[in-house]
Every structure is written in C-alpha cells, then in structure tokens.
Amino acid sequence: MRVSPAATLSVSLTTPLPITLTKARFSGEPLRLKQYVLSNQICSRPKHLLSEFKPTRRWTFSCKCRNRGRNGYAKFDDEGEDFIVVNFYRFVSIGDPEAEIEKHLSFLKDLNIRGRIYLNEQGINAQYSGPSKDALAYVEWLKGDDRFSDLLVQMSPAMNRHAFPKLKLQNKPSLVQYEGGISHLPLLDPPMRAKPLEPSEWKRKLKDLTDDDEASPSNSGKSYILLDVRNGYEWDVGHFRGAHRPEVDCFRNTSFGLSDEKEAPSDPLINVDKEKTDILMYCTGGIRCDVYSTVLRQRGFKNLYTLKGGVSHYLKEEGTAEWVGNLFVFDSRLSLPPAAYNDNVVDKAVGDNVVDEAGRTPQTPVDTSFARCYLCNSQVQELRHRNCANLDCNRLFLCCAECVVDLKGCCCSDCISAPRLRPVLHGVKRYEKWHVYRDSEEQNAPLV
C-alpha cells in the first residue's frame, strides 16, 4: 500500500478520527503496516486502522480535524525558524515498546519534528530535525524518564529547514540493520560492549600509539588497530588518520574479524592477537560500534574500545585533531565540516574558505589520499556525495564538476540512457520525488 503525495501513516490502533480516505497516484515503494509515520501533512493524532484496506489500492489522507489547514495540511510555519538535527540512542530494556510508542506519539503530536525514531525491547535510536524549540522539547521530555536521564545528545545545524521528509516512529526489530538482526546480541550487558573512551582519552590514545605504525607496519606486530566501523563511502569524505577504508558499503554486511585469512585477506583484524591487541573502534554516533563490539567480544577479542558519542561528539569536544575531512551524515545534508560541530575549528579546518550558516564549505581536502572522483579519480573540491541522476540506480557517489557535466549527473555511462533520468543538479541540492520531474515533462510535452 502506498499513499501520495502527502506523507503517510500505517498503524495498528483503532481509535476513530475524522480522516477522509481518498485515492492517490502510486508514488513508490509500499507502506508497511504497523509503522507509525507523522509529518506536517497529516493528522497529528494518527490512530486509524489501515489493515482493513487491500494492499493493491492507492490511498492518501485528507484530515478534517481542527488542527489542520486547507486540504488537511498541518499549520506549521517554518519561515524564520532555527532548525537543528538531533541524534541519540540508548540501549535499555523497554518492556512494552508499543505502549512506549504511544507515549511518544502523544507528546510529539503537536511538535514540528521529522526523522526516524526506532524503539524496541533493546532501547531507542533517533535521528530527527525540527525547529530548535521543538527538537529540544522532545529531548527534555525524554530525559524526564530515569532510563534516559543521562542521554548523550548530538546536535548540528539543519540549513534552516528539515533534513528529513517525514517522521517515522516505529517499533523496529533492529535498532540498526545488521545481517541476522541484533535482537540476540547482549547489547543490554555493558561489559559485552566495547569500553567507551571520552574524546579526550581517544585523542590521547591515538597520539600515544601513532609511533606503532612506523615501528610495526604489519597487523601481527601492532599493539592496536584503528577500526572504522562505517561504510567505505563515509570514509571517502572524512576519517581519522591511520584508519583504513572499510571494504563495505552497508553496515549490515560488516564482517571484520569474522573470517579466516583465506576468505578475507583484506580484513584489518586478520592475524591480530585477540588477547593483546587494542581494537579502537569509531563510527558517526557510536551505535554501530556498540553493536559490532558485542559481535567481536563473542569472537574472543578482549581489548575493545569505542569513541564515546562517535565522531560527531569528538569534533565538538576536540576539534579536528587526528581527523581529516568532513563527516558523512545520513540525512539530506549528506556531509558536514568540523565547523558545524565546533565553531572554534573553522580556521583550522577550512582556512580561508567561507562556511555558511549550515556548516557547508567548498573545502579542498588537505589529504590527497581520499576524496577522489569515483569516475576519473581526480581530487574533488567538495566533500559531499550526490545521487545518480538515474532514478533506478540512485547510487551515492563522489564526483568532480567535469564528470557531472560529461555524464549528465550519472554515475556511469550505462545510466545516461536510462528511461527515468532526472535533470542534472549543480551545487548542494537533493533530488525531488520522481513524479515532480515526470509531471513536469508531461506538462512541457508538445501537443499532437
């Protein structure tokens, strides 16, 4: 089932509301039942049962409640608002996730927030955007619960608009996607996770261990391994010095330390002494390291350390020490320079380049070993990925300005002739939904 053009919802509650159901044109992948989705385009009290409708039909909502404007749209005025993006997670036992979701829905119903908030029996994982007053109101409300009172919250600028298209509040089996799921992992047992290091401790440890690279270039002789537990394309725009590019494009497929030497010779954990080697793990916000460290712990790795709060927390507290480039983020911004997290590193991070209020910059990389165009291998001038213009590909890739023009915004020559080709985007822009371009072509088509 899919609804369009407004944001949609699919829940398993039965409280009746004044919602009118109307037909709409198909606009993409189907909805999932029992998935709560809120936005500023639908009723703020989503409690209508959808499971009675056939999944072969297309529907959209037109809410007639008093909180709506014309055509059922919410009355949120974003003009002049100071938007931020908020990220946090917590592994904690939640006995009744559905009841917990109801509490969150009740509080969020009147807030202008969009993003992803996942809950289950193991805790919560949230990334969302909104006006600062609304975004922080949710944080303060959550901290009123003893289970979340000391929650570590990451914040960054959101370009004065939402960084997500809608808000999903969902009871999800896995707080992060990993092959085989994570419900069986001992995430609620802190000793089974890596030991968290404060940013200052992490910085000091990296500095103290730098000499090991020169003294022992092979893994077998090192006293530590710096492990980037992200995707390769994230490393391409920024990473800690000394961290090798992860040969993975999706965290769910991460398998460091799980294969023998014959199967994965490029595994950075091959031939390391599991008893004596310090494994220093980092990711964007920390949750992927917490998850994967339990996997490594079960495989016999003893000395596991993680960067508390991830790279975003480190940049805020320590600036760019030992870090090079930008930080990839999983929202419409795609990439942020260190200055977005710490104003004091502007000069050091980007020199004379101009940083706008969103923290964007045409920063030229200082490390020429990364930030390469995926097509011609030249140095890119902007540390930000783009999506392939071919809708059916949509690959994230780094590209220089020349290749953008030559390949019409596509990631390869094969995509240029694709039937659903979107226009070339220049600068920091994101593609709209396909129907925007399709309808535009239909309107501009000559009459016959």
From Swiss-Prot:
Tagged with keyword Coiled coil: no
Q: Which domain of life is it from?
A: Eukaryota
InterPro entries from the entry? Rhodanese-like_dom, Rhodanese-like_dom_sf, Rhodanese_C, TrhO, TRHO_N
The UniProt entry, under SMART domains, shows: RHOD
Rhodanese domain ranges (all copies): 220-323
Q: Does the keyword Cell wall biogenesis/degradation apply?
A: no
**Can you say where in the cell this protein is located?**
Plastid, Chloroplast
Which CDD domains does the entry link to?
A: RHOD_YceA
Keyword vocabulary terms for this entry: Chloroplast, Plastid, Transit peptide
One Pfam family, please name it: Rhodanese
Show the GO cellular component annotation of the record: chloroplast
- Enzyme active site: 283 (cysteine persulfide intermediate)
The main location class comes to plastid
Q: Where is the transit peptide?
A: 1-23
Q: Which PANTHER family match?
A: RHODANESE-LIKE DOMAIN-CONTAINING PROTEIN 7-RELATED, THIOSULFATE SULFURTRANSFERASE/RHODANESE-LIKE DOMAIN-CONTAINING PROTEIN 2
What protein is this chain from? Rhodanese-like domain-containing protein 8, chloroplastic
Question: Which species expresses this protein natively?
Answer: Arabidopsis thaliana (Mouse-ear cress)
